Swiss-Prot record:
Protein name: Superoxide dismutase 1 copper chaperone
Record-level GO BP terms: copper ion transport; removal of superoxide radicals
Cellular localisation: Cytoplasm
SUPFAM superfamilies, A to Z: Cu,Zn superoxide dismutase-like, HMA, heavy metal-associated domain
Record-annotated HMA domain positions: 2-65
Function in brief: Copper chaperone for superoxide dismutase 1 (SOD1). Binds copper ions and delivers them specifically to SOD1.
Cofactor note: Binds 2 copper ions per subunit.
Main subcellular location: cytoplasm
Similarity section: Belongs to the CCS1 family.
Amino acid sequence: MSFTTTFAVPLECESCCDSVKQALANVQGIESVDCKLVDQLISVTGTSAPSQIVKAVQNIGKDAIVRGTGQPNSAAVCILESHAPEDQAQPIKGLARIVSVSKTLALIDITLNGLPKGTYYPSIRTSGDISDAPQSLGGVYQALGSVEVNESDSASGLFSGQAFVKSETQISSLIGRGMAVSTSPDVVKPHALVGVIARSAGVWENDKTVCSCSGKTVWEERKDVQSKGLEGQL
């Protein structure tokens, strides 16, 4: 089933809109693209993973930040962090975006980066307690298959990967639960990535470009989180 996602994109003229539409023309699953030049926003309807749309826009030298997905109260997000001592400088290693497309079906867009090459196994946990994660996250609420991390990030020797997973569940049953990403399908290892699922904005619920709390633009805030490891995932 289709859903709509809005993205903030720096647009200078109608030619920029045309370039973005052309870049997205070959992304599988896109049904329509609407470009709002004055608002510096594009909205994309279809079944494509938001992370794939961001990647396609970045491939033409522009940038894109997800501003909303799905209908009100139908979207959630989970930032996945490493608590390993060696990752203290850049703890953020992944992001999961969740959008409900029906009362019983949600799509989960999982992106991982800055990791050793290999297969990783994400799962939703019964608890959202990360005080002693991953042990405090409890047992498996829902396994989410696997993510192949095999795309070279940079000269760092680390890799990234992405998966788009269907989940027969409701967003309301996921809010507040934890997520874990482990290198084992059966055991959540001590240095697994962890995070807590929280509600996120639906389409057009967050079209502002300046944060009222910090006074920073969305692009300045993006740089802040990228310095902590969240590369190309917002």
